[in-house]
Design a protein with these regions (language model features):
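A generic structural signal for well-ordered alpha-helical segments
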Residues: 74-75, 136, 159, 192
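Short amphipathic alpha-helical segments and helix-helix/interface helices
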Residues: 71, 111, 132-133, 155, ...
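Residue-level detector of flexible, active-site-proximal loop/helix-junction positions
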Residues: 89, 127, 148, 206-208, ...
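Membrane-anchoring hydrophobic helices of lipid-metabolizing enzymes
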Residues: 2-96
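Short gly/ser/thr-rich secondary-structure transition/capping motifs
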Residues: 77-85, 148-149, 211-214
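Short glycine/serine/threonine/alanine-rich loop segments
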Residues: 80, 141, 197
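Non-catalytic C-terminal accessory region of glycerolipid acyltransferases
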Residues: 2-13, 20, 152-269
Length: 269
């Protein structure tokens, strides 16, 4: 019995070390991939056309396939599994505001890998990070500087004819471990009212919980974590607000309703 227990402990330890190593390898590969896209692929895309719109579309395609490849690599390494409910609603989404909760570090990677083309909001840290600034700037992603200009940039992007949908996480940061949802920042609601485009809710759950806010990447679970993505039907702003004119009151009301909606939907899981 003691030998069996010892063998089980050794196996458990080896499994943990494998997961830590595989996770570290995955994120190192992600960083190297960012440098490669910024230093090699992006310049080639720039040479392929003088049209800024085409450059952005092609860079977004490169990022989409890179993120899809990264997700599949993590699956092959046994780190994670995932499944999608309602993929067809997201895959070819156009001129929608796609909003999702944010439980893990890899949410944006998984979602962009699923969308044929996507515009995205990025933080200053990603905008200036040497590993990521090349790809995100070349792709025409929008810098979230917390200013009026940021809102205007998002609205302009969404109102462009046949524009790719805009992906945004209203929580603004990953959900704290043990919490269902952070408070929503008002940017998404503000953009939705001003652009007057459909809102596409996406629910993300991760079991067991990992890669949350303030959690070290090497604090890996004892088993593969599973990400479930559920894409819901689009919501029209007019269905949520009696008066959809732009005003601080309407922004607050829409923000509250969206947060309440996500809370209710996530509580069902």
């Amino acid at each position: 019995m003691a030998k069996m227990l010892k063998a089980a402990q050794i196996k458990q330890k080896a499994n943990y070390l494998w997961r830590v190593g595989a996770t570290g390898f995955s994120f190192a590969s992600f960083g190297i991939g960012g440098v490669a896209i910024g230093g090699l692929v992006a310049p080639l895309v720039n040479l392929s056309t003088r049209n800024p719109s085409l450059r952005q579309q092609r860079t977004q395609k490169v990022i989409k396939h890179s993120f899809k490849g990264f997700t599949e690599m993590m699956v092959k390494l046994g780190i994670m599994t995932y499944d999608i409910e309602g993929l067809e609603k997201l895959q070819h989404s156009k001129q929608e505001l796609v909003i999702a909760n944010h439980p893990t570090l890899v949410d944006v990677v998984v979602l962009i890998g699923l969308m044929e083309q996507a515009n995205c909001v990025v933080k200053q840290a990603l905008w200036s990070n040497p590993f990521t600034k090349g790809p995100v700037q070349n792709a025409g992603y929008i810098l979230n500087a917390g200013s009026e200009q940021f809102i205007q940039d998002c609205v302009k992007k969404l109102k462009t004819d046949q524009a790719a949908s805009l992906l945004i996480f209203p929580e603004g940061t990953r959900t704290a471990k043990g919490e269902l949802l952070n408070e929503f920042q008002r940017g998404a609601a503000n953009i939705a009212i001003r652009a007057h485009v459909p809102i596409r809710p996406v629910l993300i759950t991760c079991t067991p919980s990992t890669l949350t806010k303030n959690e070290k990447w090497y604090h890996v679970p004892s088993q593969s974590f599973h990400i479930h993505v559920k894409v819901l039907d689009a919501i029209q702003v007019d269905d949520l607000l009696e008066d959809a004119t732009v005003s601080p009151k309407n922004v607050r009301q829409l923000n509250h309703q969206l947060h309440q909606f996500f809370n209710q939907e996530l509580s069902k899981k």
